[in-house]
């Protein structure tokens, strides 16, 4: 992680699945390690997700607090070249993970199950999670930031695909099993005017699926690094979205 930040020198970093084991502070440790390499970054205490800024932080906020491992969202504000920026990190609920149901696995237990009978059945599972609750809270806060002249960026692990990626043209690829699914979180973001940065640059999910999960590890068998070893579970569930009124 440190080497990648040193290599890229990003203005902001969003972390997902942060764990402050043994009463430690993960982002403070990262900042200290970067300081040893001559880079100054700022942060604040978080749990489950985390944020770093190369620019002084003017405010921080817990938008969706972590409770019982259902994810979290935090926000910082800063400025870059005189432009006000609000950056959010999001790790959304991993349970009721309905894109597994669409592939014949239960999205909470990851045991094999019969395929759903309909898209409605998939969506019923999907909205049982807290992902949509969290993203609605994000949108509400982001609208306040936008009204105050901030550019808004959200990055993180949504644990849910994009409705732009489960379409008619690829419904028989990647074990979509014929389903065209209007996934909730990305639909809500798009309706609120947010731009999916990757899909903006690469609008065709057939030529650029943009898979972010699972990652490959030649040292491990598929059963050790996947939740659904008998299915093609490749998907894009990690995103950077943005919105500006300027």
Q: How would you label these PLM feature ranges?
A:
Residues 1-37, 235:
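N-terminal, active-site-proximal structural segment of metallo-dependent hydrolase catalytic domains
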Residues 1-3, 53-246:
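Active-site regions of metal-assisted phosphoester/phosphodiester hydrolases
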Residues 10, 47, 71-73:
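Extracytoplasmic
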Residues 11, 40, 195:
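Short acidic/polar active-site loop segments enriched in Thr and Asp
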Residues 16-19, 45-46, 201-203:
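Short, solvent-exposed turn/loop segments enriched in Gly/Ser/Thr/Pro and often Arg
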Residues 18-24, 47-51, 157-161:
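Acidic helix-start/capping segments at beta-turn-to-alpha-helix junctions
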Residues 36-41, 56-59:
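Short small/polar-residue motifs
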Residues 38-50:
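A short, structured active-site edge motif that brings together acidic residues
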């Amino acid at each position: 992680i440190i080497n990648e930040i040193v290599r890229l020198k990003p203005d902001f970093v969003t972390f997902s699945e942060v764990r402050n084991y043994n009463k430690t502070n993960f982002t403070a440790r990262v900042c200290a390690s970067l300081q040893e390499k001559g880079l100054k970054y700022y942060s604040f205490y978080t749990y489950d997700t985390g944020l770093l800024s190369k620019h002084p932080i003017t405010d921080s906020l817990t938008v969706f607090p972590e409770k019982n491992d259902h994810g979290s969202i935090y926000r910082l504000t800063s400025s870059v070249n005189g432009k006000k920026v609000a950056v959010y990190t999001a790790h959304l609920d991993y349970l009721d993970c309905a894109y597994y149901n669409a592939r014949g696995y239960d999205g909470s237990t990851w045991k094999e199950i019969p395929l759903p009978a309909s898209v409605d059945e998939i969506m019923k599972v999907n909205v049982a999670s807290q992902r949509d609750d969290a993203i609605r809270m994000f949108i509400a806060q982001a609208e306040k930031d936008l009204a105050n002249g901030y550019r808004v960026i959200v990055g993180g692990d949504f644990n849910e695909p994009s409705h732009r990626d489960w379409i008619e043209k690829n419904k028989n690829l990647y074990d979509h099993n014929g389903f065209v699914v209007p996934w909730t979180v990305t639909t809500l973001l798009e309706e609120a005017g947010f731009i999916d940065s990757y899909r903006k640059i690469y609008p065709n999910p057939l030529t650029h699926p943009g898979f972010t999960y699972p990652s490959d590890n030649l040292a491990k068998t598929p059963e050790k690094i996947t939740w659904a070893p008998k299915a093609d579970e490749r998907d894009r569930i990690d995103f950077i979205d943005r919105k500006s009124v300027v």
